[in-house]
């Protein structure tokens, strides 16, 4: 309401959400189970059956915002967890709210581009990141494209990827380049791994082993190793072509 009343506000909310944009009011159904739980994550490696994944409260927020005087459109720029949109719970009402949320998100709350974060194509690397398998991104993109077609829209899905994450090798990045080329993605939203305190990834990067399994984990650390991974994002740039071909030959990817 305060934003809508600002004199220079034009009626468009650019990002109604934030990190984990579709986890509003989600929590354990039985909190007694949560108190005894030893899992470090409610959504990895799979969504916990005790997690309430009902999207109805969030839909009600969207409807309330859109009904305010002065609000023309509200958009979700990024932060959507598509693994939660694909999750099938045992509650039919919850599944229906998720389906309704997905359609409403795509048809009413995308400003032309929806940014999502598959982060990698290698399931081995994704597991270290505590992210869902890449096949879930394929499925979400299929749904996104289908709903766009049905609604007569021409919106884009913009994936975010990361290089040099612990566990990621040049071979993994070469495969990422092949997959994103097949998907016709000219990647823009990319980043090199940056260690941040209190994360499993940083523990693995610093120690060279996975903190839970104590298995060795490779991490690209030198400038040469990092650049060798990063360049695979940009297979479509002519200036990167020669270096990429040379690197592919080094790792035995003559295809």
Named regions from a protein language model:
Residues 116, 159, 180, 190, ...:
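Hydrophobic, well-ordered secondary-structure elements that form the walls
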Residues 2-10, 136-143, 177-212:
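C-terminal, active-site-flanking charged/polar segments
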Residues 198-255:
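Radical SAM enzyme core and accessory elements
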Residues 66, 106, 181, 236-237, ...:
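Ankyrin-repeat helical core positions
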Residues 165-182:
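Catalytic cores of alpha/beta
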Residues 2-158, 163-166:
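Conserved SAM/AdoMet-binding glycine-rich loop
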Residues 58, 62, 98-102, 187, ...:
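Alpha-helix initiation and N-capping motif
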């Amino acid at each position: 309401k305060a934003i809508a009343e600002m004199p220079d506000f034009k009626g468009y909310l650019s990002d109604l959400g934030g990190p984990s944009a579709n986890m509003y009011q989600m929590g354990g159904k039985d909190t007694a189970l949560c108190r005894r739980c030893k899992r470090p994550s409610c959504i990895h490696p799979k969504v916990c059956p005790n997690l309430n994944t009902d999207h109805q409260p969030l839909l009600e927020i969207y409807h309330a915002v859109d009904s305010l005087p002065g609000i023309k459109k509200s958009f979700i720029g990024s932060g959507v967890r598509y693994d939660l949109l694909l999750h099938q719970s045992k509650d039919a009402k919850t599944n229906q709210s998720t389906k309704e949320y997905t359609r409403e998100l795509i048809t009413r709350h995308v400003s032309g581009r929806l940014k999502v974060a598959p982060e990698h194509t290698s399931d081995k690397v994704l597991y270290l990141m505590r992210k869902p398998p890449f096949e879930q991104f394929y499925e979400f993109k299929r749904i996104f494209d289908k709903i766009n077609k049905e609604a007569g829209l021409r919106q884009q899905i913009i994936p975010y990827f990361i290089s040099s994450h612990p566990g990621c090798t040049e071979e993994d990045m070469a495969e990422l380049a092949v997959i994103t080329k097949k998907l016709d993605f000219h990647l823009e939203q990319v980043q090199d791994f940056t260690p941040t305190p209190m994360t499993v990834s940083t523990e693995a990067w610093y120690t060279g082993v996975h903190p839970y399994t104590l298995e060795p984990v490779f991490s690209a650390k030198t400038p040469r190793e990092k650049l060798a991974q990063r360049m695979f994002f940009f297979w479509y740039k002519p200036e990167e072509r020669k270096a990429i071909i040379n690197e592919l030959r080094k790792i035995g990817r003559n295809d």
